[in-house]
């Protein structure tokens, strides 16, 4: 189980990313069609925004354990929890393959 402080930190990053998403998106679109001087100004504005507002700072975490690695997007679970739940028949439509 991940520490609760790490999970809270990730939630704070998600909130910041949602708050600054439209601002960052509009600045990035403007920088594609702007002159060099305007691009420097836009770059400075992007740099002045909070670091944790960038979408690359987000991690997907397991919904049951909070583990940040080996996550399956379709289920929102880490690999070993997915395997345990599949063996316990808690995931509908998931069966162990045999051939």
Curated annotation (Swiss-Prot):
Annotated Pfam families: Ribosomal_S14
Q: What PROSITE patterns does the record point to? A: RIBOSOMAL_S14
Task: Report the InterPro entries cross-referenced here.
Answer: Ribosomal_uS14, Ribosomal_uS14_bac/plastid, Ribosomal_uS14_CS
**Superkingdom of source:** Eukaryota
Q: Which UniProt keywords apply?
A: Chloroplast, Plastid, Ribonucleoprotein, Ribosomal protein, RNA-binding, rRNA-binding
Localization recorded for this chain is:
Plastid, Chloroplast
The question of whether Ribosomal protein is a record keyword is answered with yes
Recorded GO terms, molecular function?
A: rRNA binding; structural constituent of ribosome
Annotated Gene Ontology cellular component terms: chloroplast; small ribosomal subunit
Q: Which GO terms describe its biological process?
A: translation
- What Gene3D superfamilies does UniProt report for this protein, alphabetically? 1.10.287.1480
Stretch list, region Disordered: 46-67
Q: Which family does it belong to?
A: Belongs to the universal ribosomal protein uS14 family.
Q: What does this protein do?
A: Binds 16S rRNA, required for the assembly of 30S particles.
Its assembly, as annotated, is:
Part of the 30S ribosomal subunit.
Q: What is this protein called?
A: Small ribosomal subunit protein uS14c
- What organism is recorded for this protein? Pinus koraiensis
